[in-house]
Regions:
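Alpha-helical interaction elements
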Residues: 92-165
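A general alpha-helix detector
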Residues: 14, 84, 143-146
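Short, charged/polar connector segments at secondary-structure boundaries
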Residues: 1-72, 86-93
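Acidic/polar active-site rim loop that often engages polyanionic ligands
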Residues: 78-87
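Generic hydrophobic, aliphatic-rich segments that mediate packing or membrane embedding
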Residues: 55-56, 81, 99, 103
């Protein structure tokens, strides 16, 4: 037990959707491991919201076990979504459907970030008839290719997974 005050951290429903639920056996093993060895990985937090480590946080607060917090600095919610997707895509227990969903969400978040960054640099840019930034300024294929290279998919597969998001 420790005498430090436990920080009140929040979860976010949108961020929670990005995390595939764990099996009961995993939860039991994680709790036992933290109880025996302490919390070895920090809880990643952005603006008081847990991005990674919500299960660790829950276990540590339940048993009054010390844990570290890593404060993440993101300019936007989309960058926080991108971080969560990257962390979750490292998991080996993801279902195929969840992996598609995460790739789609990552693609959308990175597209939104690219559009926001472009509009900050070029505030007078006219939008196309759909109210979007033209492909000649922010190319979907470029962003999809970067994601595809990172996770071993073709760019067309990444853009296709946008429908799952």
């Amino acid at each position: 037990m420790n005498n430090r005050p436990v920080p009140e951290l929040q979860t976010d429903p949108e961020f929670d959707e990005l995390i595939q639920p764990r099996e009961e056996k995993y939860l039991e093993e994680l709790e036992e491991n933290i109880f025996d060895h302490g919390c070895l990985e920090p809880v990643c937090v952005w603006n008081g919201i847990i991005l990674d480590g919500r299960l660790r946080y829950k276990i540590c607060t339940k048993w009054d076990i010390h844990f570290n917090i890593q404060r993440m600095m993101f300019e936007s919610r989309d960058k926080a979504v991108s971080f969560i997707c990257h962390e979750q895509l490292k998991r080996t227990d993801l279902t195929g459907e969840y992996k598609k969903y995460l790739i789609g969400r990552l693609f959308r978040a990175d597209m939104n970030t690219a559009i926001d960054e472009f509009m900050k640099k070029h505030p007078g840019t006219e939008l196309n008839a759909d109210g979007q930034v033209s492909q000649k300024y922010v190319r979907k294929t470029d962003i999809a290719t970067i994601i595809g290279n990172e996770f071993n998919f073709g760019f067309s597969t990444v853009t296709k997974y946008d429908i799952y998001a």
